[in-house]
C-alpha cells in the first residue's frame, strides 16, 4: 500500500514556534515529526511514499531527498522511496490528490505531515479490506467531543452521519471523532479536477455518510495533531514519556475493568432506560485519571 502525506500547509496557528520551518519539520524529541511518520510507515512495511509539499517545500525535499539516504539526526537510513508533488498554489487539504491520481492505482493510506501517531497500520488496513468501502476513517475518542465533529456509525461500522461541531446532536452520543488517518480508494478522485481549493472532509468524505461506502475504524491508539503550541508541547511530552508508544495495539495494553451497576452508577435494579443511568460521585474524574495514565477503562 502506498502512503500519501499531505505536507503543504502553512501552519499559521503554530507559526510562532515553527519560524522558518514547515510544520512537518518541527522536532519531536530531536527528530522532525515527518521523519517519525516515515519511520512508523517503514517499520510496518509501507515503503512507497508520495509527499505533497508547498510552503517551504525545499526544507522537506532537501532533508529527505528520495528516501534513499540517511537521517541527519540519527544517521540511520530512511528506508523508504519518496516521490513529491509540489503545489504551485494552495489547493486545500485535498486538491493535490486530484493532481496525483495517475500515480494512485490502488487503495492508499492518507495522512497529514504534522500528525504524531503510533498505530497498528496492518490492523487498520485489514479492516478496510474486509469491509470494502470507498473510504475508511481512523476514529477515536478525544477529550473535547462537545466542540468536535462527531462520527455516527451503525453496528457494522458504516458511517451514517458526520456531524460538524455546529450541528445539533442528540442528548447521548458516542465520543468518536476522525483522527486524521484515512484509507481511500482512487475511485474517489475520478471525474473532472475541481478548481481551486478542495476540502477533504466537507467535499469528499462527508457526502459519503449514509451511502454505506464510508467506514470508521475505532481504536484507542495514539494519534494527535500539533496544530497549536499547546498540542505540540503535549505531543513532545507524550513521546518522551512513552505514552504514545504504549497505546499501539501491537503491544500489550494495561486495562482497568469496571463493574457497572452499583459500582460506577447508581443501582436501580434492572437498568432498562438510559435516562435512569446516573454516575456516582467521583466516577467521571476517576475514569479521566485512568485515561490520562494511558490505561484502558473497560466497563463490564
What does each of the following model-derived ranges do?
Residues 1-19, 250-261:
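N-terminal nucleotide-binding beta1-loop-alpha1 segment
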Residues 2-5, 26-113, 121-123, 228:
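Conserved N-terminal catalytic core of the sugar/cofactor nucleotidyltransferase
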Residues 10, 114-115:
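Active-site metal-binding loops of divalent metal-dependent hydrolases
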Residues 45, 132, 291-294:
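Glycine-centered short loops/turns at secondary-structure junctions
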Residues 52, 283, 287-300:
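Substrate-recognition element of Asp-dependent hydrolases with the DxDx(T/V) motif
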Residues 55, 136-153:
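Short beta-strand-to-loop element that shapes/binds the nucleotide-sugar donor at the catalytic cleft/hinge
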Residues 108-109, 116, 122-129, 140-145, ...:
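Catalytic-core segments of class I nucleotidyltransferases/pyrophosphorylases
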Residues 126-130, 269-288:
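Basic, amphipathic juxtamembrane/active-site segments
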